[in-house]
Amino acid sequence: MSLADFMEQRVQVITNDGRVVLGSLKGFDHTTNLILSDSFERIISMDQDMETIPLGVYLLRGENVAMVGLVNEELDSEIEWTKIRGEAIPDVVH
Protein backbone atom coordinates (compact mmCIF):
# COMPACT_ATOMS: atom_id res chain seq x y z
CA MET A 1 0.00 0.00 0.00
CA SER A 2 1.07 3.56 -0.62
CA LEU A 3 -0.13 6.83 0.85
CA ALA A 4 -2.23 7.30 -2.30
CA ASP A 5 -4.42 4.44 -1.04
CA PHE A 6 -5.10 6.45 2.14
CA MET A 7 -6.34 9.63 0.43
CA GLU A 8 -9.61 11.05 1.81
CA GLN A 9 -9.57 8.49 4.63
CA ARG A 10 -8.97 8.90 8.36
CA VAL A 11 -5.36 8.16 9.26
CA GLN A 12 -3.34 8.10 12.46
CA VAL A 13 0.15 9.56 12.36
CA ILE A 14 2.79 8.93 15.00
CA THR A 15 5.52 11.54 14.91
CA ASN A 16 9.20 11.08 15.73
CA ASP A 17 8.63 12.85 19.05
CA GLY A 18 5.78 10.49 20.01
CA ARG A 19 2.74 12.65 19.25
CA VAL A 20 -0.42 10.96 17.93
CA VAL A 21 -2.34 12.97 15.32
CA LEU A 22 -5.49 11.81 13.53
CA GLY A 23 -7.19 13.37 10.54
CA SER A 24 -8.40 12.91 6.99
CA LEU A 25 -5.48 12.64 4.56
CA LYS A 26 -5.87 15.38 1.94
CA GLY A 27 -2.42 15.41 0.39
CA PHE A 28 1.20 14.26 0.56
CA ASP A 29 4.42 14.53 -1.40
CA HIS A 30 7.55 12.47 -2.08
CA THR A 31 9.12 13.54 1.24
CA THR A 32 6.05 12.38 3.20
CA ASN A 33 4.88 15.89 4.04
CA LEU A 34 1.22 15.32 4.95
CA ILE A 35 -1.86 17.54 4.82
CA LEU A 36 -4.66 16.48 7.19
CA SER A 37 -8.10 18.02 7.62
CA ASP A 38 -10.45 17.71 10.59
CA SER A 39 -7.38 16.71 12.56
CA PHE A 40 -6.77 16.43 16.27
CA GLU A 41 -4.05 15.28 18.63
CA ARG A 42 -4.65 12.60 21.26
CA ILE A 43 -2.60 13.00 24.41
CA ILE A 44 -2.59 9.93 26.64
CA SER A 45 -0.85 9.87 30.01
CA MET A 46 -0.71 7.67 33.09
CA ASP A 47 -2.27 10.15 35.52
CA GLN A 48 -4.83 12.17 33.52
CA ASP A 49 -7.79 11.55 31.25
CA MET A 50 -7.01 11.39 27.55
CA GLU A 51 -6.94 14.90 26.11
CA THR A 52 -8.06 15.77 22.58
CA ILE A 53 -6.65 18.93 21.01
CA PRO A 54 -8.41 20.05 17.81
CA LEU A 55 -5.96 21.06 15.07
CA GLY A 56 -8.21 21.54 12.00
CA VAL A 57 -6.22 21.62 8.76
CA TYR A 58 -2.71 20.52 9.72
CA LEU A 59 0.57 20.09 7.88
CA LEU A 60 3.08 17.54 9.14
CA ARG A 61 6.62 17.73 7.81
CA GLY A 62 7.83 14.43 6.42
CA GLU A 63 11.00 14.52 8.51
CA ASN A 64 8.79 14.34 11.62
CA VAL A 65 6.59 11.42 10.48
CA ALA A 66 7.42 8.02 11.98
CA MET A 67 4.28 6.08 10.98
CA VAL A 68 1.03 6.55 9.05
CA GLY A 69 -1.82 4.05 9.26
CA LEU A 70 -5.50 3.81 8.43
CA VAL A 71 -7.93 4.16 11.32
CA ASN A 72 -10.60 1.50 11.72
CA GLU A 73 -13.32 4.02 12.55
CA GLU A 74 -15.77 1.39 13.82
CA LEU A 75 -13.23 -0.01 16.28
CA ASP A 76 -11.99 3.48 17.21
CA SER A 77 -15.53 4.61 18.09
CA GLU A 78 -15.99 1.60 20.41
CA ILE A 79 -12.96 2.48 22.56
CA GLU A 80 -13.70 4.42 25.75
CA TRP A 81 -10.81 6.84 25.27
CA THR A 82 -11.48 8.63 28.58
CA LYS A 83 -10.52 5.41 30.39
CA ILE A 84 -7.29 4.82 28.47
CA ARG A 85 -4.03 5.39 30.36
CA GLY A 86 -0.52 4.85 29.11
CA GLU A 87 3.08 5.95 29.01
CA ALA A 88 4.16 8.47 26.39
CA ILE A 89 5.62 7.04 23.20
CA PRO A 90 9.38 7.64 23.35
CA ASP A 91 11.18 9.67 20.68
CA VAL A 92 12.38 7.79 17.60
CA VAL A 93 16.13 7.20 17.68
CA HIS A 94 17.90 6.91 14.32
UniProtKB/Swiss-Prot annotation:
Q: Which species does this protein come from? A: Schizosaccharomyces pombe (strain 972 / ATCC 24843)
Q: Where in the cell is it found?
A: Nucleus; Cytoplasm
Presence of the UniProt keyword Ribonucleoprotein in the record = yes
The UniProt function text for this chain reads: Component of the nuclear LSM2-LSM8 complex, which is involved in spliceosome assembly. The LSM2-LSM8 complex plays a role in the biogenesis of the spliceosomal U4/U6-U5 tri-snRNP complex by accelerating prp24-mediated annealing of U4/U6 di-snRNA. The LSM2-LSM8 complex binds U6 snRNA terminating with a cyclic 2',3' phosphate group; RNA with an unmodified 3' hydroxyl or non-cyclic 3' phosphate is bound less tightly.
Q: Which PANTHER family match?
A: LSM1 (PTHR15588), U6 SNRNA-ASSOCIATED SM-LIKE PROTEIN LSM8 (PTHR15588:SF9)
The UniProt entry, under Gene3D superfamilies, shows:
2.30.30.100
Q: Which CDD domains match?
A: LSm8
Report the domain of life of the source organism.
Answer: Eukaryota
Q: Which GO terms describe its cellular component?
A: Lsm2-8 complex; nucleus; precatalytic spliceosome; telomerase holoenzyme complex; U2 snRNP; U4/U6 x U5 tri-snRNP complex; U5 snRNP; U6 snRNP
Tell me which InterPro entries the record gives.
Lsm8, LSM_dom_sf, PTHR15588, Sm, Sm_dom_euk/arc
Ranges for domain Sm: 1-74
Q: Pfam families in the record, alphabetically? A: LSM
Per UniProt, the keywords (alphabetical) are: Cytoplasm, mRNA processing, mRNA splicing, Nucleus, Ribonucleoprotein, RNA-binding, Spliceosome
Instruction: Kindly list the GO molecular function terms attached to this UniProt entry.
Output: mRNA binding; U2 snRNA binding
> What's the family?
Belongs to the snRNP Sm proteins family.
Q: What interactions and quaternary structure are annotated?
A: Component of the heptameric LSM2-LSM8 complex that forms a seven-membered ring structure with a donut shape. The LSm subunits are arranged in the order lsm8, lsm2, lsm3, lsm6, lsm5, lsm7 and lsm4.
In Swiss-Prot or TrEMBL terms, this protein is called LSM2-LSM8 complex subunit lsm8
Q: Which GO terms describe its biological process?
A: mRNA splicing, via spliceosome; RNA folding; telomerase holoenzyme complex assembly
Grouped into one coarse class, the protein's main location is nucleus
